[in-house]
Amino acid sequence: MKKQNKPIISNLLVGSDPEVFLWNNVNNEFHSAVGFIKGTKKKPLQMDNLPKGFMWQVDCVALEYNIPPAKNEGEWIAYHKQSLKYMKEHLPEELDLVIQASARFNANHLNTKQANTFGCDPDYNVWKGEQNTPPDAIDNLRVC
């Protein structure tokens, strides 16, 4: 029997919801995103004048953004560039976006409930099918 090379999935779309940190160029420190935008994990904020699906919200102390489903790599990259440009244009001038996995924050940026909320709500263990217990904040390290 001859094997056929047919795609298993057709019309695959790829989205994304990465986080970025804020760096304060005046104080030379990482700055909490809490209070800069009204978007939350439960109610993300649509980015003005961009198509449906471009959203942003606070996640712990980071800014999280969402892109619409992309049909190909070029579209996916373009959506990320649009989102990063939008966020930079809508933040105070002294704040820059920093793309890295983790950052240490001064204690004055960690005194809100939001700054001490980690992970998805709720978050599940895929192997056990059970809800995970959210991690506790141990020090001033925050991760994306």
Kindly give the residue locations of the regions a language model identified:
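Terminal catalytic/cofactor-binding subdomain
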Residues: 1-143
